[in-house]
Every structure is written in C-alpha cells, then in structure tokens.
Amino acid sequence: MHKLIYNALATSYGVKLKDNQKIKMNKTQSYDRIAFGYDFIAGLFSFNQINKSQLAFVSHLSTQGTCLILGGGTGYFLQKLLEENKTIHVTYVDASVKMIASAQKRISKKRPSELYRVSFICKHVEDFQFENYDLIVCNYFLDLFDDAYVTLLIERFKQHLKKDGLLYITDFSIPEKGFMHWSTKVGVKILYTLFGWITSLSVQHLPNIKSIVLQNNFVLLESVAFFKGALKCNLYK
C-alpha cells in the first residue's frame, strides 16, 4: 500500500523512482515520544542555536497574509511569527498529537488573543491537502526525509505558493571543511540514530535541501549560518 501511494505521488509530480529509491516513511513513527523534551533536547544539543536560527528572518514576515508551517513542533516559531505579523493566518501542521497540544498550550499562554489566527492540524504531510499560501515554513522538518521525497515536497510548495510567496527553511548543514565539518557529521549521525531509535525514522543522512530548492527555480534571497555553519536559515522566493 505504501509503495502504491508513493509511486502515485511520484507520478503526479513527474518523478520516477526506482525500487531502491523508494521513499521511506513509516506512518507509525511517533514523535509523541519526544514532545515532552523536544525543546530541552534542541537547546542542549545546540546551546539554544536551533531556536535562535529559526528566527533569523522573522522580521521579513510582517506583511504576509497566509502561512503554512510544516512540522512546527512545540510552537516556538509560531509564537514569534504571531508577534511579528499582526494579521497573518497560519495553518499549523504536525504529525504528533502531543506536539500540537504543546503548541496550542504555548499560544494559549503567551498569545491567547491570537489563537483564532491559527488552525492546528494533526496530520502527516502526505495526508495534508495543500491550499495556496503567501509563506511556507519548514524549520528542522525536511531533514526527516530523503532527497526523493524532499523533491516532491519542494515541487508541491512551488505549486501552492502565491505570486511573490516566500519559502522559509531552517535546517542542519554540514560545513565544508575543518573541525566543524567532522564534528557536525558526527553530531548529525548521533541525532539520526537517536531519532531512529525513538521514532523508527529510516533516514540516515541529510537531504540536499538547498540544491533541490534551487533546482526548482526558487531564488535565494537571504541566508545566514549559526553554530559555525552547522545550522542555516535560508529565505527563498
């Protein structure tokens, strides 16, 4: 069944996948198991640079009307976006019931008057029905997938971004050389092993996110590195 679903997706987006390139997504993956400690783990691993990196270009997001956030986790970025943009309406998608609950709790506590501007949806991205948006945000989300599925997602983003729409991506990056090149590779490997053990995640290495985005005719507007190049926030149009 999974093979049929993903082959159908690939066909619909013009991508042919060989048997050894099958998109590996296990719908039994449960990020509920890490929801309670997600912010702590993220902060500990990166000395809070993961949270900081997500906000690199939030000041550029003050005029958009509609936004899709995929894999939004516990709602840190969502809170900051609502504070920056006083009129935006956000569709907030996460596969974890507990992550969604944490995000709702955060906004209820920090920005209670803004809850009406957020639609919380608990679904896997392959089950989500896209609409059209001024902004699509993927913070530490695309690293959960292999190149083939990231390609499908980026093509879909292209279809569903409005004219002059923005694509906002923050994720891990391997520095080209030096100590941080090797230490980041080891750190990312440890994270994938940990997440694989907890959630049954099958991906073992970072996808080539930037290359895939640029191949789909997005233009890089802004880019900034954190944690000596191990984390990057990129803003595309």
Report each predicted region and the residues it spans.
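A conserved beta-strand element that flanks and buttresses the S-adenosyl-L-methionine
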Residues: 137
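N-terminal, positively charged/glycine-rich alpha-helical extensions of SAM-dependent methyltransferases
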Residues: 2-37
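C-terminal alpha-helical "lid/dimerization" subdomain adjacent to the S-adenosyl-L-methionine
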Residues: 170-216, 223-224
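A short glycine-rich, Lys/Arg-flanked "PGG" loop and its adjoining helix->strand segment in the class I
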Residues: 151-163
